[in-house]
Regions:
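Thiamine diphosphate
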Residues: 1-162, 167-168, ...
Length: 312
């Protein structure tokens, strides 16, 4: 269905289809419409595809105002500019006021590659997870993104979509059923649970093939919604396997690892291992290089998994 398609193309296909049928849907960019793929929407919907220039705070404030009048705004930028740069507007104008604004941050974490440390957001989930009334969602592939967008549009409230921008490794087929508030059991297993999000789901799958040859049966859960966390699916899996690794393309402070740790310390105390960015800024490089630098390779996952099992 989406073979070879970039995530931004899938997003724009949905927005185009939706704007054609719903005059209340609005897209607001901040000088990155070409990079995020929404530029051509201006020709078809010149009054509803808006570019505010390099003025992200205004983008968020305009969206909040339009939402208060019944519109359904989607705001887009690179992840650091869609989150930390407009944090106050997200907190007060959007979330405090419970406005129906969808915030899309593209190329999170190391997926920013060549834009360097200033354009790499390792902290966006940590910054936003503490803001009430906000759902945080990270689609794993094009199929999940496309199936999630109608659900997110219908959800009446603020949602942050942390989205890979280019071609993502396929995880799901066309028959995939999406539930915003239920994590996906991608692979069932009995020995250890790998809780992963975004680009790290593929690393979990690759590691599971290596571990399978060593007699280790891995369960993999795609935790696409980091807030609110699907506690039931996670706890059921960990009660079964009694071992856990958390994998995320984010700082290990404040993101999925922190959310899982907060859950387990209250409801299922256990020692777990983790893969992610170790409290540092990013740097320029292709993703394979950055994964190696950050300790996020398949081999790192294999090692962390064996360590988690040793804690049983």
């Amino acid at each position: 269905m989406f073979e070879g398609k970039e995530m931004r193309q899938v997003l724009c296909q949905f927005l185009d289809e939706t704007m054609a049928n719903d005059p209340k849907v609005v897209v607001i960019d901040a000088d990155l419409a070409k990079a995020n793929g929404t530029f051509n929407l201006r020709n078809k919907y010149p009054d509803r595809a808006i570019d505010v220039g390099i003025a992200e705070q205004n983008m968020a404030s305009i969206a909040a105002g339009m939402a208060s009048c019944g519109y359904k705004p989607f705001i887009l930028s690179f992840t650091p500019f869609a989150t930390r740069r407009i944090c106050d507007q997200i907190a007060i104008s959007i979330c405090y006021a419970k406005q129906n604004v969808k915030i899309i941050g593209t190329d999170p974490g190391i997926s920013a590659e060549f834009n360097g440390g200033t354009h790499m957001s390792m902290e966006d989930i940590g910054v936003l997870r503490s803001i009430p009334n906000l759902v945080i969602f990270e689609p794993v592939d094009a199929v999940q993104l496309y199936k999630s967008l109608p659900v997110i549009l219908e959800y009446n409230g603020p949602v942050y979509i942390r989205m890979f921008r280019k071609v993502a490794d396929p995880i799901f087929g066309d028959n995939y059923n999406f539930d915003l508030f239920k994590a996906d059991i991608v692979k069932e297993g009995t020995d250890v649970t790998l809780l992963a999000s975004g680009i790290m789901v593929k690393e979990a799958l690759k590691a599971s093939e290596i571990l399978k040859n060593e007699g280790i049966n891995v369960e993999i859960i795609n935790v696409h919604t980091i807030k609110p966390l699907d506690e039931e699916t996670i706890l059921n899996s960990l009660r079964k396997t009694k071992a856990c690794v958390v994998l995320e393309n984010h700082n290990l402070i404040g993101g999925l690892y922190s959310a899982v740790s907060e859950l387990l310390v209250e409801k299922l105390p256990m020692r777990i291992t983790k893969i992610g960015v170790k409290d540092r800024f990013g740097e320029v490089g292709k993703m394979p290089y950055l994964k190696e630098v950050m300790g996020m390779t398949t081999e790192d996952v294999v090692e962390a998994t064996k360590k988690a099992i040793s804690y049983k």
